[in-house]
């Protein structure tokens, strides 16, 4: 394999005699961040001395797109999903939706295949040199993108909190004297140390971190298979089964598609001439392998709780996912505890994209926010995530289920509008005038996107199924959640109808 990290990203000298870039493509060379005597420049010079990535949402020049390894793309998502959070999604099949083994496995398979497609698709836009939310301006316009940025910030923070709770459960299962808030702090601070440094360190960490986690999951698989405690819970029948499959599928889809809104953030240093097919395939492999393996493992292990009073049942009731896995590893003694610690720390790989991208997304909100260096926003986002995770620790299942559905809803609408615009109105990658990304007068007005979003929300409401509300179409689907499917369909159809009028009246 070619050297994956033989490139040098943004390690700029502390003082560079240069002027701002005046090229027509809007790209900003890295050395310009340290030019001048402003507070911003001084902070950036300090960052350069510490080898911290200085670039925020500024477009990456072609000369700095030196990440030539395709494996860096796949390993990013391989590590981010080869984690205990994926295991927790599989557990929901029985714990929340009361599915049997085979139907839960099939749901995991098909909804993951559907959910990852948009992540693979949007990863292909990174070589344009723009972060995902910045590139979104070319679909939604200057102001509408800010609304999606707010949703993306909520998604990043929510993901970070939910994942930290899973890791905290693992640490609590190892040592019950470790309170939930302390475990959340440990995991969040470890993640901050990686993401604070920036793109190169994030990719370097993700490149290797999946290996020990994969080994631990193989140990869990082997130990559980040897125990003979697997229970082949039969499939359900009738309309209630359909409702459970659709609702669990929505949660699985939400987890798989959750990276959609910042997929391009992790391919911006790929060369501009990188094959879109290679990016798509590398992303697909990096996602589908860990998602299917770990979620299906979670489905299988959770079947053992069907025996009431068993160590699995007691462990899950006491310490959630951590207690369940601890029950599997119990025969291994102290080595089993070591494996639990490895799994707890796997959350760092899971949360790196969230901590890194939340900072970039905040910068999209205003010029003032962009003037605050990325790494400072990363620090701020970490604090907010901790504040969300600690009170949510004791209500994890409810938090996770509701959050997965929220992710599925809004990302389905976002994807529908962007995909329709790409294939119908831009007619492929050649139809973009990327240089207009920061020229609001040349971007779409956003009226069509706004109305389409409203229609998407209407579709979502009619199809959603939550404890506090069940939409009329969901009721006809046996209470199954079809919110993301209807949100996508309503948004796509309405955008196709409205966008031609927007182009006709505004010319953009």
Swiss-Prot record:
Kindly provide the name given to this protein in its UniProt entry: Purine-cytosine permease fcyB
| Alphabetical list of PANTHER family matching this protein | PURINE-CYTOSINE PERMEASE FCY2-RELATED
Name any Gene Ontology BP term: purine nucleobase transport
Gene encoding this polypeptide?
fcyB
Membrane topology according to the record: Multi-pass membrane protein
**Organism name:** Emericella nidulans (strain FGSC A4 / ATCC 38163 / CBS 112.46 / NRRL 194 / M139)
| Keyword entries, A-Z | Cell membrane, Membrane, Phosphoprotein, Transmembrane, Transmembrane helix, Transport
Q: Where are the transmembrane segments?
A: 73-93, 105-125, 148-168, 178-198, 201-221, 244-264, 279-299, 324-344, 375-395, 405-425, 443-463, 478-498
State its role.
Answer: This permease has a broad specificity towards purines, and also transports cytosine, but neither uracil nor thymine. Contributes very little in purine uptake. Its major role may be the uptake of cytosine.
